[in-house]
Amino acid sequence: MEDYKQRIKNKLNVVPMEPGCYLMKDRNDQVIYVGKAKKLRNRLRSYFTGAHDAKTTRLVGEIRRFEFIVTSSETESLLLELNLIKQYQPRYNILLKDDKSYPFIKITKEKYPRLLVTRTVKQGTGKYFGPYPNAYSAQETKKLLDRIYPYRKCDKMPDKLCLYYHIGQCLGPCVYDVDLSKYAQMTKEITDFLNGEDKTILKSLEERMLTASESLDFERAKEYRDLIQHIQNLTNKQKIMSSDKTIRDVFGYSVDKGWMCIQVFFIRQGNMIKRDTTMIPLQQTEEEEFYTFIGQFYSLNQHILPKEVHVPRNLDKEMIQSVVDTKIVQPARGPKKDMVDLAAHNAKVSLNNKFELISRDESRTIKAIEELGTQMGIQTPIRIEAFDNSNIQGVDPVSAMVTFVDGKPDKKNYRKYKIKTVKGPDDYKSMREVVRRRYSRVLNEGLPLPDLIIVDGGKGHMNGVIDVLQNELGLDIPVAGLQKNDKHQTSELLYGASAEIVPLKKNSQAFYLLHRIQDEVHRFAITFHRQTRQKTGLKSILDDIDGIGNKRKTLLLRSFGSIKKMKEATLEDFKNIGIPENVAKNLHEQLHK
């Protein structure tokens, strides 16, 4: 054990006093942290001398060796650091990749564009507007535009006119040669509206309302009036921050007790439409952490570069400009400076509000995993992955995996599996298949390995998993089994070659954590199994109806989504989406038996 400490000590003596990046590695030779420094030797030595906060202490405790790369400048170090973080995705770095996603409205780049709500931005595939405060806000805006403009709705062009054409919400480009100039005009008006210019659309609706009223079509006139009110309500809900309608993001931050909070205000058309809060445990200086953060922030698909980015004046503008390809502004006075100060103040408030909760939560969860590691005689299990199977007499067998990091659920790393190779209700073989698939992929893609694997089951499940890991994949990862009592409650943890009971008190934090893990993986597996059964049941009902093949089945599922909606549909509804009358009658009769 002491050998690695001596190796680290010896290597520290040859690290140069130059700028560069460093990579910390654990006992499995996995990169667990990437950092940068103006002077590599000083920064690296600081990790192995003096006292640290809890997170840094845990990081240092896992380091078995390090590597470093010398660069010619601080800017080059920052760019290299961002690339290394993207490449290795170390667990001790603040990884923003999947943590947050925001809803945008997209106009697709197609001959006949569509209007979509999406959380993924793919450059070159269309125009994006947002982000929106939440999915509901984006969906409501899209629904409003769908009612006003007969834009194409179908993902793929159908062979026949769909329901949207018959209700006046599509021009039918799948069948008719729609005038492209008319479509372009609609696109312009939608774009103007999404950019905050609602006068054109309001004027158009007012003209339609007046025409309908003069034609004594009062029902249609009322519909236009309601749409006008809806638009006015939608635009009035947002807080006006500025009469300047430049699209900009405003950054402010606060630092205290080894933590950094960064707030981002998304300003669109003079309105603050959303804000983002990120907490970062400081591993570098606050300026260095900020440069890394903002570099990651805009290298991800869910963040579109605005026209301007406003940041505090104490930061190096050139460093930010090297990783953010848009106009960087550091306001010195006036409303723009006030906005940066407001973001910083909000960061400070958020930091203060979170401290007590973070402290309480950290102490509880860290104590739980430390206690678990001590009782099992293993290294503190920072990353735990747990598996559970679900099926009814072998029908639609599925499995699920949940991930806990630092004793807390890491939902973006949950996974679902449909059992592919096992016939009938064989829990052991199902568990072997899923573990084989999971960790084959982890090895192939260089993903982080867990410190502990937990299976819902006993010695048989454990032995099967250990056999796959050690004899097929060459992995040595601790495997434990969680068993339940006759009341289906978490009862005991099994570990070791003979699956002995780990002595945990029922009122301990470690036992409570295991209870949470078992409940969570069971919930996740059951929910997935229920969803799978519903889909299977839905398809089987349609399979039994004459005249309904794969194409019509897909059409029905896409148009109605559920058996309940199909039962509520009329014969005309089925005919309107292209179902022949005789098949529609048969379908209608079968659904109402």
From Swiss-Prot:
Superkingdom of this protein's organism: Bacteria
Matching CDD domains = GIY-YIG_UvrC_Cho
Entry-linked InterPro entries: GIY-YIG_endonuc (IPR000305), GIY-YIG_endonuc_sf (IPR035901), GIY-YIG_UvrC_Cho (IPR047296), RuvA_2-like (IPR010994), UVR_dom (IPR001943), UVR_dom_sf (IPR036876), UvrABC_protein_C (IPR050066), UvrC (IPR004791)
**UniProt GO molecular function:** DNA binding; excinuclease ABC activity
The UVR domain extends over 199-234
Gene Ontology terms, cellular component aspect?
Answer: cytoplasm; excinuclease repair complex
**Which SUPFAM superfamilies does the protein's record reference?**
C-terminal UvrC-binding domain of UvrB, GIY-YIG endonuclease, RuvA domain 2-like
Every copy of the GIY-YIG domain together lies at 17-94
Biological processes, Gene Ontology terms:
DNA damage response; nucleotide-excision repair; SOS response
- Keywords carried by this UniProt record: Cytoplasm, DNA damage, DNA excision, DNA repair, Excision nuclease, SOS response
Intracellular or extracellular location(s): Cytoplasm
Give one Pfam hit by family name. Answer: UvrC_RNaseH
Describe the protein's quaternary organization and the partners it interacts with: Interacts with UvrB in an incision complex.
Role description: The UvrABC repair system catalyzes the recognition and processing of DNA lesions. UvrC both incises the 5' and 3' sides of the lesion. The N-terminal half is responsible for the 3' incision and the C-terminal half is responsible for the 5' incision.
The entry's family comment says: Belongs to the UvrC family.
NCBIfam families membership: uvrC
Provide the protein name.
UvrABC system protein C
Question: To which species is this protein native?
Answer: Staphylococcus aureus (strain NCTC 8325 / PS 47)
The gene from which this protein is expressed is uvrC
